A protein has these predicted regions:
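Acidic/polar low-complexity segments with low predicted structural confidence
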Residues: 1-98
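DG-centered beta-turn motif at the end of beta-strands
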Residues: 54, 104-109, 191-206
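Short acidic, S/G/P-rich loop/turn micro-motifs used as interaction or catalytic elements
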Residues: 111-113, 150-151, 200-205, 231-234
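Von Willebrand factor type A / integrin I
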Residues: 213-281
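Phosphate/oxyanion-binding active-site loops and adjacent basic polyanion-contact surfaces
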Residues: 46, 50, 116-123, 166-174, ...
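Surface-exposed acidic, glycine-flexible loop patches that form ligand/cofactor-binding
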Residues: 93-95, 133-135, 182-189, 215-217
Length: 281
């Protein structure tokens, strides 16, 4: 999966001219060193490796001819040399941490079915692949689903396949991300990206709570990308999410951190890729 995503990210970046990240932020280098008892040394060290020491003592006494009958061994007759003692010693190991953490958010309420969900998920797969290439595979993912309540799910399969028949409160997904980031202090170690896919429905018509959570997110987020995939029956009307994102002025106020893309449900891959360019430009 990781190798395939990286290759797709390379193709998206090179063949489809998706932009390269010029500056990944202050958290670009997240290699650290840890010390583990992985190396062994004879004679001196921190912790005696009893099994390895016993093996070495037996080998020494076999070589000296002090074990004539291997089926009748008396440990009291062993000669023990200081060089037979095997110790584990601390070794400096390089531990790479992920540079980017991506939250994928998806409305899975009753109205999110068929082509709309497929378009959202396809775009999110491509976004993940692009980031894998940009960050040289150092990417972690978290998956959030929401209807009137938000929940985190463990993997992409659940993220893609789960659905319910409830209504929609968009703010719950953004609030959950904020709560997770603050509780786990994730902004300290990661460049954080948030991508939300929806059909534009929201019971919170003026988006007051959603806008509050987005403002709260601006403290740490590298990019928020909102994709609205409209049902064909919407026509020329604006969805609730489009209305309040545009009328609030938040897209202009935070133009370097939040982007909006709107597309119809009958999209092909080329249009999805054009949407990605808009979200990450």
């Amino acid at each position: 999966m990781e190798a395939n995503a990286y290759e797709l990210g390379r193709v998206l970046s090179q063949d489809f001219q998706l932009p390269n990240l010029k500056d990944k932020g202050k958290k670009r280098s997240l290699a650290r060193y840890v010390y583990e008892l992985t190396d062994k040394n004879k004679g001196v060290g921190q912790i005696l490796d009893k099994k390895a020491t016993l093996r070495q003592i037996v080998q020494t006494n076999l070589a000296l001819g002090r074990i004539p009958n291997v089926s009748d061994i008396n440990p009291a007759d062993f000669l023990v040399s200081p060089h037979d003692l095997v110790y584990r010693i601390l070794s400096r190991e390089k531990d790479f941490e992920s540079q980017a953490l991506v939250f994928f958010l998806r409305d899975y309420s009753g109205s999110m079915g068929g082509k709309v969900t497929q378009a959202v998920v396809s775009q999110h797969v491509m976004l993940y692949s692009w980031l894998m290439y940009q960050y040289e595979k150092q990417v972690e993912t978290r998956f959030i689903l929401h209807d009137t309540e938000a929940r985190e799910v463990a993997d992409f399969y659940k993220y893609h396949s789960y659905k319910v028949a409830g209504g929609t409160k968009v703010f719950t997904a953004f609030k959950l991300v904020n709560d997770i980031v603050e509780r786990e202090n994730l902004d300290r170690d990661y460049n954080i990206y948030v991508f939300h896919g929806t059909d534009g429905d929201d019971w919170d018509k003026d988006g007051k709570q959603t806008l509050e959570e987005i403002e709260r997110m601006m403290r740490y987020v590298a990019r928020i990308g909102v994709s609205i995939v409209e049902h064909s029956y919407v026509g020329s009307k604006q969805t609730e999410v489009e209305k309040y994102l545009k009328s609030s002025g938040i897209l202009e106020k935070h133009k370097d951190h939040i982007k909006l893309d709107i597309m119809g449900e009958n999209v092909d891959d080329s249009r999805i890729i054009q949407g990605i360019k808009k979200l990450i430009s």
